[in-house]
UniProtKB/Swiss-Prot annotation:
InterPro entries: Ribosomal_uS15, Ribosomal_uS15_bac-type, uS15_NS1_RNA-bd_sf. This is Small ribosomal subunit protein uS15. It comes from Bacillus subtilis (strain 168). The keyword Ribonucleoprotein applies. Keywords: Ribonucleoprotein, Ribosomal protein, RNA-binding, rRNA-binding.
Length: 89
């Protein structure tokens, strides 16, 4: 369920804004989105896992706050990220 270090490094390399970037909003949102998608698949098969569902809701809230921050700070970066991740259909 947890995201592997290898996958996390792959996401960081894909979404980084500069060479030593690991904590920009884009990277954080990409990592959260991947974790949310994995947890969503888990919850489809384990419908009564309420403990994990609460973790999912917390991650969705955190991602939402980061997206709001990015939208207020730089709309073009926000739109690029939304398109790249396939959010907001």
């Amino acid at each position: 369920m947890a995201i592997t270090q290898e996958r996390k490094n792959q996401l960081i390399n894909e979404f980084k804004t500069h060479e030593s970037d690991t904590g920009s909003p884009e990277v954080q949102i990409a990592i959260l989105t991947d974790s949310i998608n994995n947890l969503n698949e888990h919850l489809r098969t384990h419908k009564k896992d309420h403990h994990s569902r609460r973790g999912l809701l917390k991650m969705v809230g955190k991602r939402r706050n980061l997206l709001t921050y990015l939208r207020n700070k730089d709309v073009t970066r926000y739109r690029e990220l939304i398109n790249k991740l396939g959010l907001r259909r």
